[in-house]
Structure formats: C-alpha cells, structure tokens
C-alpha cells in the first residue's frame, strides 16, 4: 500500500502541520479531503481545538484520562458514533454436475459458522469514515484497531480510517517532566503504529496516521 509523509498545501491547513505529523496510506488523505469533506472538516476542527496541559500529562491513567475524552466532547455531538459489529459466515458446498467446471444449482451441504466476525468496535464512525485515538494504551492496541478498520472496510462499512496517537517528539516533554516511565516505548505512539502500517496490517483499508506533536 502506498505511503506518503504529507506536506502542507492549500488543501491541508498549515496550522495542522505545525502541530501534527501526518502519514497517509492508500491515499487516505485524498479520500478524506475529496470524498468526505464534511467528516474531514469535523476531524480537522477537533484537531485544531485539541490541547494538552502538563497537569493532564501527569494525571494517572491511560486511554481513559481527560485527554482522549476531549475528542468525545467534540465528535459525539456531531453524530459520530461508537459501533460494534458481529457477523456469521454461511458456507455452501456445491457438487459437480456433469462435465468438469459445472456445478449444481443446489448445495449438498451448508456450514454455518457463528460469530465469524466477533465484536470488533471502533470509537467513532460517521458516514463511511472511522476514527480512533490511542493516547497511552499498550501498543498491541494498534493490532486491534487495525484489524477492526480492516474488517469494517472488507465488509463495505467504511472507506477510510484515521488513527491519532503521540508523535515521537513528545518524548522530549515527557523526559523534562520525568514521565517516561508512564509514556514508555511499549505504549501507543507513532513509532509503534507506522511499522504495523508499513507491513500492511490494515489490509486494503486506507489509513491516515496522525501524530500529536509538541
């Protein structure tokens, strides 16, 4: 999947690039800007409003602190919804009918596989855009997020996903505040997300990865 590290243009406001790192996989940014301008505009507005204080950085907790909830306050009133999906797989086996390559119109066996898709949830979905924030969870959370977005994409529910997390340069602030023990290398940040995207764990789903800069 093609990846690009984005640079500011007239389409993508300069003030966002001053505050965030952007990496686009599968032309995710172009899809958002051209096909979903309303949804992207709401995300853009949420990113512009987003701020963090040193007091919030010091507060105990991971992804349930006040920091991630700032996106809740902006997006949920705009009809972004948390959604979970499940799905059953119904497999039909058709016997050969006559010559090779022709098959009966009726299956001779049917195999139902319950909960083939089981409980994938995404924090924010609107129209065909998915959005998730991973501030300070275990880095394996990215595997869950990417599998969920890939599954929603394969099922025809979404066309593009967005994941926001910490950029590497925030480590300078964490070190100055003596917080590196809390925001360690095994938590969610761009250094853990990008290799997963480079190895295509998102499947065919276009993903815009956004890193919060200092």
PLM regions and their residue ranges:
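Catalytic core segments in nucleotide and nucleic-acid processing enzymes
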Residues: 135, 139, 144-161, 178, ...
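Domain-level recognition of nuclease-like catalytic cores that cleave nucleotide substrates
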Residues: 167-214
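Hydrophobic, Leu/Ile/Phe/Ala-enriched alpha-helical segments that form helix-helix packing faces
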Residues: 67, 71-79, 152-153, 190-200
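Glycine-rich active-site/cofactor-binding loop and its immediate structural neighborhood
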Residues: 130-133
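Nuclease-adjacent, charged terminal/linker segments that flank catalytic cores
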Residues: 1-88
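Soluble or luminal CAZymes and related metallo-dependent hydrolases
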Residues: 63-67, 141, 185-192
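Active-site metal-binding core of divalent-cation-utilizing nuclease and nuclease-like domains
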Residues: 57-60, 69-127, 140-147
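Class I S-adenosyl-L-methionine-dependent methyltransferase catalytic core
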Residues: 58, 62, 116, 157-162, ...
């Amino acid at each position: 999947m093609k990846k690009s590290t984005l640079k500011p243009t007239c389409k993508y406001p300069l003030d966002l690039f001053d505050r965030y790192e952007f990496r686009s996989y599968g032309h995710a940014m172009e899809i958002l800007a051209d096909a979903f301008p309303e949804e992207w505009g709401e995300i853009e507005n949420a990113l512009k409003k987003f701020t963090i204080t040193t007091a919030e950085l010091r507060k105990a907790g991971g992804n349930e602190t006040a920091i991630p909830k700032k996106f809740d306050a902006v997006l949920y009133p705009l009809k972004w919804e948390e959604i979970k999906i499940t799905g059953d797989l119904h497999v039909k086996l058709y016997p050969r009918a006559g010559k090779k390559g022709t098959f009966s119109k009726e299956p001779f066996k049917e195999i139902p596989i319950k909960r083939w898709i089981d409980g994938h949830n995404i924090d924010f979905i609107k129209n065909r855009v998915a959005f998730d924030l991973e501030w300070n969870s275990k880095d394996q959370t990215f595997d869950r997020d990417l599998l969920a977005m890939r599954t929603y994409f394969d099922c025809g529910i979404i066309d593009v996903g967005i994941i926001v997390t910490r950029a590497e340069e925030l480590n300078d602030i964490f070190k100055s505040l003596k917080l590196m023990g809390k925001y360690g290398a095994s938590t969610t940040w761009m250094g853990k997300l990008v290799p997963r995207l480079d190895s295509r764990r998102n499947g065919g789903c276009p993903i815009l990865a956004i890193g919060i800069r200092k």
